[in-house]
């Protein structure tokens, strides 16, 4: 028995060495300051700055509770990811962990679902950029696709010049987002605390009770809204991908993850509560940031425009992060055979440029959608992005559970940074993600049609696997000698099925 355990541990160690070889070529240039701000910025994006307006109309003050619930489960997912990162930092993030603990088929599904997530999220961000630009009347007649193309040019260039520059620019993007929320919280609190009227109307809790209470449309609309709010936290797992290019991920990642939960509480829950105490919840509009709505009503010249520049930066930040993630995820998939061979190529700046260019092509499709149906793009692709997010987060939780099992069996070393309450919190998070899928079905028509498309997505994934399995088998036949013969046989048999 002891011999079998030892052999299993050696076999798993061999697989880890093979996976670590996939990290060659990256430049570990990110410092603590940058990782901290990337983690914060990942939790603050278009979902809050643009999506909150429409969601306040749908759920009213109950949106704060929805953000809190989603924020707690997002923290569980981040802690699970942190556990995996301390086990083995990887730019391939949970796709690489799926390959280690679940096999190549799981890595294939995880990778392509995550790509769907970021591809759709990028289209949402492109749409957001165009909507923000239309806030200024001078640009009202300019088609959305013009602004979308300009945004793609900017972020595409940023991602090609090296990870150090990406991290630095993302640091400043995130800092601007944080400062915007902080300024709103300070100004809004002053108005609320001093009893200063806004547009001649008193602020305070009466704005909730006088406008239908905490659940103005009932409980069901607030519950269904969870599937939309999930999108607001879509970038939190970015810190896992960034860990592969950190100078010291063992110290930086836990610190960054632990700082996220209270910031979610302050920035999301605190902001929504303050918004509904300053203005009636139905004063906020879909298509316009609620923060822009608030500052515009202060009567201070140009304050609305200044805030609009800030939220425009937030959309560009999210788009920038999406390109960063997809480039590295596609390279990880390519190294295992689940994506085309050319996507593994790196530039002299240590950038996986092929994957980034492939993502840019998909984003161009988003620009085309902006041209065809500019008014509906945001909601249409939001639901498809949610599918990718749910799948990605589910893989993180399952991989974390398999890591715990591997540690228990002696196949992997224990880690100091763990998900609190596991495995209960692991199963609870998976149940939450499943409930989000169920709730999406009630969001007619977009959510209902999205859930109805799941069989088609499954068929496409199966067809795609048959297209890549030969290359998967070939890669594992020529795997480096660090993987032992038994491991190679297992991998080759898996690829052949």
UniProtKB/Swiss-Prot annotation:
Sorted UniProt keywords: Amino-acid transport, Cell inner membrane, Cell membrane, Membrane, Transmembrane, Transmembrane helix, Transport
GO cellular component terms, semicolon-separated: plasma membrane
Domain of life: Bacteria
Species annotation: Salmonella typhimurium (strain LT2 / SGSC1412 / ATCC 700720)
Compartment annotation: Cell inner membrane
Entry keyword annotation includes Cell inner membrane: yes
Membrane topology: Multi-pass membrane protein
One family name in Pfam for this protein: AA_permease
Family matches, as InterPro entries: AA-permease/SLC12A_dom (IPR004841), Amino_acid_permease_CS (IPR004840)
Family: Belongs to the amino acid-polyamine-organocation (APC) superfamily. Amino acid transporter (AAT) (TC 2.A.3.1) family.
Record protein name field: L-asparagine permease
Chain segments annotated as transmembrane: 34-54, 58-78, 109-129, 146-166, 171-191, 219-239, 264-284, 298-318, 353-373, 378-398, 422-442, 448-468
GO biological process: amino acid transport; transmembrane transport
């Amino acid at each position: 028995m002891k011999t079998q355990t030892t052999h299993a541990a050696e076999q798993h160690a061999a697989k880890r060495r093979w996976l670590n070889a996939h990290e060659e070529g990256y430049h570990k240039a990110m410092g603590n300051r940058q990782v901290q701000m990337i983690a914060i910025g990942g939790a603050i994006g278009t979902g809050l700055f643009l999506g909150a307006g429409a969601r306040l109309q749908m759920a009213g003050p109950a949106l704060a509770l929805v953000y809190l619930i989603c924020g707690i489960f997002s923290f569980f997912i981040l802690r699970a990811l942190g556990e995996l990162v301390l086990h083995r930092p990887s730019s391939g993030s949970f796709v690489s962990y799926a390959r280690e603990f679940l096999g190549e088929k799981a890595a294939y599904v995880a990778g392509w679902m995550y790509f769907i997530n970021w591809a759709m999220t990028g289209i949402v961000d492109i749409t957001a950029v165009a909507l923000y630009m239309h806030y200024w009347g001078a640009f009202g007649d300019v088609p959305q696709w013009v602004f979308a193309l300009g945004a793609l040019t900017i972020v595409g260039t940023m991602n090609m010049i090296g990870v150090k520059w990406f991290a630095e620019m993302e640091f400043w993007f995130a800092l601007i987002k944080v400062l915007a929320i902080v300024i709103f919280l300070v100004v809004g609190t002053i108005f609320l605390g001093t009893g200063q009227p806004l547009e001649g109307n008193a602020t305070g809790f009466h704005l909730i009770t006088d406008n239908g209470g905490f659940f103005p449309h009932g409980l069901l609309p607030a519950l269904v809204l969870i599937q939309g709010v999930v999108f607001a936290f879509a970038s939190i797992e970015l810190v896992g991908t960034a860990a592969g290019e950190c100078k010291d991920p063992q110290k930086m990642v836990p610190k960054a993850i632990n700082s996220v939960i209270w910031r979610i509480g302050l920035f999301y829950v605190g902001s929504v509560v303050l918004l509904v105490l300053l203005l009636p919840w139905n004063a906020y509009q879909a298509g316009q940031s609620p923060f822009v709505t608030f500052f515009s009503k202060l009567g201070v010249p140009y304050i609305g425009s200044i805030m609009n520049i800030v939220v425009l930066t937030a959309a560009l930040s999210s788009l920038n992060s999406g390109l960063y993630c997809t480039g590295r995820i596609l390279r990880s998939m390519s190294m295992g055979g689940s994506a085309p061979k050319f996507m593994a190529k790196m530039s002299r700046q240590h950038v996986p440029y092929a994957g980034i260019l492939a993502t840019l092509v998909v984003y161009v499709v988003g620009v085309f959608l902006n041209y065809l149906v500019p008014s509906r793009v945001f909601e249409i692709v939001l639901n498809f992005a949610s599918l990718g997010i749910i799948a990605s987060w589910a893989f993180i939780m399952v991989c974390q559970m398999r890591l715990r099992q591997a540690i228990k069996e002696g196949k992997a070393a224990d880690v100091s940074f763990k998900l609190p309450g596991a495995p209960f919190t692991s199963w609870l998070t998976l149940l939450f993600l499943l409930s989000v899928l169920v709730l999406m079905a009630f969001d007619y028509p977009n959510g209902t049609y999205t859930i109805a498309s799941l069989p088609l997505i499954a068929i496409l994934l199966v067809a795609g696997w048959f297209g890549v399995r030969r290359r998967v088998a070939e890669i594992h036949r020529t795997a480096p000698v660090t993987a032992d013969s038994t491991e190679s046989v297992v991998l080759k048999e898996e690829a052949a099925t």
